[in-house]
Amino acid sequence: MEDQRDLRARLESSLAEGQRLREEVQQLKAILDQHSIPLPQLRTPQSPGERCLPAPSDISQVGTLSDNQAKITLFRSLFRGREDVYAERWRTKDGTWAYRPAGQKDWLAVLASSPSERRKVDRQTRTLYTVTDDVIRQHLAGKKTIGIYPLLLDETCWLLAADFDKKTWQEDSLAFLATCKGARVPAYLERSRSGNGGHVWIFFEAPIPAVLARKMGCALLTQTMERRHHLGLDSYDRFFPNQDTLPKGGFGNLIALPLQWMSRQNGNSLFVDDDLHQYPDQWQFVALNPASWGRSSGMARQ
């Protein structure tokens, strides 16, 4: 009985304290309004183990002349997927290029298995590499080409990317980009590494369910087709993430990251404007204000 009275007393005290804090917040807001001071943007707390985004002031100051670490920090705050695994581009035995999860093969386990089981055993025993600053540094320097798996373990995502990769990719991606702007959804067009396609990137202020992100993408795509009847959007290929839920035993689809140095030398893997001209300072262009991502998150949740 004593415990119940004590619990009730603490509950009443907490409720009173909460009311006092709410009144104090309202008073502070009134003072800010009186002096025309905007309410500071609060960042969403991250889940345990997740990296924090750099402060908006830090992001907005990054440009071509910034040091490499500042660029890497900015890059990782934008192009975020799973950090316990990433994909790397490699040349197969027949000379073609493909992507695979980066990791160390367990040769003893692979060679001990039958030839028909070796690929399966490799997937099961491979030690996967995690995303690090050095991995991003090598990508940006052109020493390797990496991709991310945007679908997180809890089936949320930090971003949505629309892939256009056929003959009409330019007009189709620009039409989609215009729809995003009309909906006040910040979106950014990258010419893909091949130069024959484009990715329209949309970022969120915090991870949102992939199903909501993809529904938002579909709504924007539908609006684009309704607004531009003469465009069939034949070049549209898919969204990343490409699944609402994580496939059993897999990572979901990967997307190659932009700004890879070797591709940039050919005018590809770069962000372009409405005339498909690359921005002079790529880093300044992607130095986005995280507060603007809230509009993307808000629309996705509608």
Please annotate each region the language model reported.
Residues R51-P54, N196, Q265, Y279-D281:
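Short acidic (Asp/Glu) and glycine-rich catalytic loops that position anionic groups and cofactors
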Residues Q41-S66:
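Acidic, low-complexity intrinsically disordered tails
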Residues E17, D58-S66, P241-K248:
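Intrinsically disordered, low-complexity regulatory segments in eukaryotic proteins
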Residues S36-L39, E190-G195, R228-R238:
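Short, glycine/acidic-rich hinge or "gate" loops at secondary-structure transitions
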Residues D3, L7-R10, E17, E24, ...:
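Heptad-repeat coiled-coil/leucine-zipper oligomerization helices
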Residues L140-A141, T145-L177, G182, E205-Q302:
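DNA replication initiation modules
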Residues E2, D58, G63-N196, F203-A219, ...:
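Signature for HUH/AEP ssDNA processing cores
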